[in-house]
Amino acid sequence: MISACTIIPIHPPKFKWAYLLLDSYLEFVNQPHELYFVFTNENEALDFKTNVKNPNSYKELILSHPLRNKNSIINVKKYFGLFTLKDKYDYIGVFDCESKFVRSCNLNEIYKDIATKKEFKANVASIGADIIKGIAEKLNLNYNKKLLLETDFYSVYWWFNEIPVYDMKYFSEFANWFCNLPNIDEIHSDYYCFDFLVYSIWLICFKEFKINIYKTKNKFECGAVEEFRVSDEDKNNVSEVFDSYWSTNFNNYLHYNKIKIIFQIDNNI
């Protein structure tokens, strides 16, 4: 059994980035590992495949018809992939196609390492903190004592400070809880109800997951690791402090052996 896989939601305007991601995946990711692209419909899947050198290098998932016109389609695609594959793998990494592998890596081991730490790397964040609080309110968890304490009363943010990895031994229980929320359609339609933040808030509230708050030289509006609009000095500081497996430190990532992926590469222009 292959222990882990990666899910990437894509659509035609992003195909050029997905091709780059796939090429880097084939160059750097140790096998066996399985990569899934999630398409909106059969035509998009076919269009993408026409320009792939090796069509067997990835697997495809295609949204069911009732989901194709949902708002916040990226989140919907991620959930669809997770629900479809939840019984097949131990760990699933989910991220966007504007990413590129830059070093040889064993994703199965990396995903296991991230998931088994049972922590989320966070930083104080002005805008991000409000996003977390807003999601908690929609989940009716905003007064949960564990969440209040772990987030330092909604002052931090953690999405994209590390590769988003789902530990599937928790996912079925989470999925059952999530699908029974009375306002699930509202959550699906809300752009800011990001899939991994919903999942991680649930883990903090109901499982033994913690938030580890990292201090950096600079202040950030959202996640420190994803912030690309800062100086190289600030990016280097973040790379050193967070020691994450991925980064937006486009110019200096080669100086940090832990970094296996650079993301938001569409902003490196």
Q: Where in the sequence are the language-model features?
A:
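N-proximal low-complexity "stem/linker" segments adjacent to membrane-targeting elements
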Residues: 1-20
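Short, acidic, metal-binding catalytic loop of nucleotide-sugar glycosyltransferases
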Residues: 23-32
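Short beta-strand/loop segment that forms part of the nucleotide-sugar
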Residues: 32-43
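Active-site-proximal specificity loops/subdomain of glycosyltransferases
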Residues: 44-87
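Short beta-strand-to-loop acidic/aromatic patch adjacent to the donor-nucleotide binding site
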Residues: 88-102
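Conserved catalytic core of nucleotide-sugar-dependent glycosyltransferases
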Residues: 102-187
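A glycosyltransferase accessory/donor-loop signature
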Residues: 175-269
